[in-house]
Amino acid sequence: TAGLIGDTGTTSYGSSKAALIFATKTMATELGVMNIRVNALAPSLTKTDMFDQMEEKARNKILQSTALKRPAEVVEVANAALFLASDLSSFITGQVIRVDGGLTT
């Protein structure tokens, strides 16, 4: 979600994520004529090894800003990817699906 919201000290990281969002939207318009869909996921904190290595204060700050007050499970992010890869999303392209528990709400 760093490409969708700003935060102190995240200029480089957020800019790189925003560039991926732009690339997703641009590629969707370029490849749509070939029936190729391009979408992206924007997950927030996800329970991974990286999550476990975060400073507790930083982790809690983000979790308190999240509507669901918890990190995503890896399977929850994977399920969003499976949806986008399936025929259930056949008319979705150029979108950024926020799997963020309400962080960017």
Descriptions of predicted regions:
Residues 40, 63-88, 92, 101:
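C-terminal helical subdomain
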Residues 16, 24:
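Active-site helix of classical SDR
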Residues 29-33, 90:
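Alpha-helical segment proximal to the catalytic Tyr-Lys
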Residues 52-66:
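A short C-terminal helix-loop "cap" of Rossmann-like NAD(P)-dependent dehydrogenase/epimerase domains
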Residues 13, 21, 91:
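Catalytic tyrosine of NAD(P)H-dependent dehydrogenase/reductases that use a Tyr as the general acid/base
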Residues 21, 38, 42-53:
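Short, flexible catalytic-loop segment of classical short-chain dehydrogenase/reductase
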Residues 1-5, 103:
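Active-site segment of SDR-like NAD(P)-dependent oxidoreductases
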Residues 4-10, 32:
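Active-site "substrate specificity/gating" loop of NAD(P)-dependent dehydrogenases
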